[in-house]
A protein has these predicted regions:
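Short Fe-S-cluster ligation motifs
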Residues: 5-13, 17-18, 67-94, 112-135, ...
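Iron-sulfur cluster-binding cysteine motifs and their immediate structural context
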Residues: 46-57, 91-106, 122-136, 191-201
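Boundary-flanking segments of nucleic-acid-binding domains in nuclear regulatory proteins
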Residues: 169, 178-180, 192, 201
Length: 205
């Protein structure tokens, strides 16, 4: 049975193994079993690597101290779990302001909306920063077939059972679920994970 993997080092592109690639237009792209994807942000062939990372001296290393701390917000029927480090500012949680507040004034009120509405909002969180418990049981797996989804001018969304292997032990930072986001712009301080820097940098691709 083929196992989907993302394998790379601080100095290499993202190497996707046995993982379908979905373009920003929603169409499945034709790729070999091992596909080299840009993460320096400078390739002229995005989402693919064209070797530019070696020319510009790209180093895909985290710039800050990686620290995962889970915050639990318990309600009557559901517990919201938040991993602040993984948040990349997608903003979907703000669609349910009664529960999650706004970007400038976040809050976590697990009893402020129906459970179904909260769960639906949490499932929109691409980074895995938000998850939930029901009767203290984690609910973190939402996707089936592994796949990579390219966001236009944004990160690479990894969905399904994809194993991440790199030289920074980044897998230890990931949630126990089946989705996370990887930086494509080269500017994240949490590399290889996305921190939302693509927006402020005006990344295109």
């Amino acid at each position: 049975m083929q196992k989907s993997q993302m394998i790379f080092s601080k100095y290499s592109p993202l190497m996707a193994v046995d993982t379908p690639l979905i373009g920003s237009d929603g169409e499945t792209m034709t790729t070999p079993r091992v596909c080299s994807l840009c993460r320096c942000g400078a390739s002229s062939a995005k989402p693919y690597c064209d070797g530019t990372h070696s020319q510009i001296g790209f180093v895909g290393e985290r710039d800050d101290s990686a620290k995962t701390e889970l915050e639990y917000y318990r309600g009557r029927d559901l517990t919201i779990v938040y991993d602040r480090y993984l948040c990349m500012g997608a903003g979907h949680c703000g669609e349910l302001e009664a529960v999650f507040g706004t970007h400038d004034a976040p809050r976590y009120e697990p009893d402020a909306a129906p459970v179904d509405a909260i769960v639906a909002t949490i499932k929109k969180c691409p980074s895995g920063a938000l998850s939930y418990l029901i009767q203290d049981e984690p609910r973190t797996h939402y996707y089936g077939t592994p796949r990579l989804v390219v966001e236009q001018d944004g990160p690479l969304h990894c969905r399904g059972a994809i194993t991440l292997i790199d030289d920074q032990d980044s897998d230890q930072l990931l949630p126990k679920g089946d989705h996370f986001t990887l930086c494509r712009c080269g500017g994240s301080k949490k590399k290889p994970l996305c921190d939302g820097s693509h927006a402020s940098l005006g990344f295109k691709g």
